[in-house]
């Protein structure tokens, strides 16, 4: 497990210490990250690893959001730019850029993100569905989580990993 993931777990543990949750309320855990100016999250159970950017190889005839493939300890995985997937312009990587290595069933891929934020705990009752009028890509979004004074868009890993080419 990477040090960043351990740090996120530690911060989450500290934040939850002393806070009283009702026993009958389901609390879901996510990893938060920034793409552009917005905060997104994916379920913590889908995260295998968080790594600093490593080299990747372009693959011809793939959508522009598939940056290519990268080799992580002898395993080759596709690398998906969430910026490009969401229709934002590409940005060069910087010191905050990370790859989230995610899994859904037997599919594994890397998500190229702008910046990691924190481990997030949200009560199921604090997650609202996405209004249908907002986007044609609603299937990518599980819902909008409300945490303190901010909103976090919760993504469906399984939908992002679906091939649309």
Swiss-Prot record:
CDD domains, sorted: CheW (cd00732)
What S-S linkages are listed for this chain? none
Extract one GO cellular component term from the record: cytosol
Give the GO terms filed under biological process for this record. chemotaxis; signal transduction
Q: Do you know which Pfam families this protein is assigned to?
A: CheW (PF01584)
Q: Which InterPro entries match?
A: CheW, CheW-like_dom_sf, CheW-lke_dom
Changes seen on gene knockout: Deletion abolishes swarming.
**What family does the entry list?**
Belongs to the CheW family.
Chain's role: Plays an essential role in chemotaxis signal transduction system in order to colonize the host stomach.
**What is the protein named?**
Chemotaxis protein CheW
Q: From which source organism is this entry?
A: Helicobacter pylori (strain ATCC 700392 / 26695)
């Amino acid at each position: 497990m990477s040090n960043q993931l351990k740090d996120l777990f530690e911060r989450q543990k500290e934040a939850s210490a002393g806070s009283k949750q009702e026993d009958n309320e389901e609390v879901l855990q996510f990893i938060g990250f920034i793409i552009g100016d917005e905060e997104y999250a994916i379920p913590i159970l889908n995260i295998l690893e968080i790594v600093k950017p490593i080299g990747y190889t372009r693959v011809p005839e793939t959508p522009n959001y598939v940056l290519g493939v990268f080799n992580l300890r002898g395993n080759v995985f596709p690398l998906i730019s969430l910026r490009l997937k969401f229709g934002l312009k590409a940005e060069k990587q910087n010191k905050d850029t990370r790859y989230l290595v995610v899994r859904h069933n037997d599919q594994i891929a890397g998500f190229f993100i702008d910046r990691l934020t924190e481990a997030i705990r949200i009560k199921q009752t604090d997650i609202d569905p996405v209004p249908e009028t907002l986007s044609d890509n609603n299937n990518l979004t599980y819902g909008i989580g409300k945490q303190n004074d901010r909103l976090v868009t919760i993504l469906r890993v399984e939908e992002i990993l679906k091939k649309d080419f």
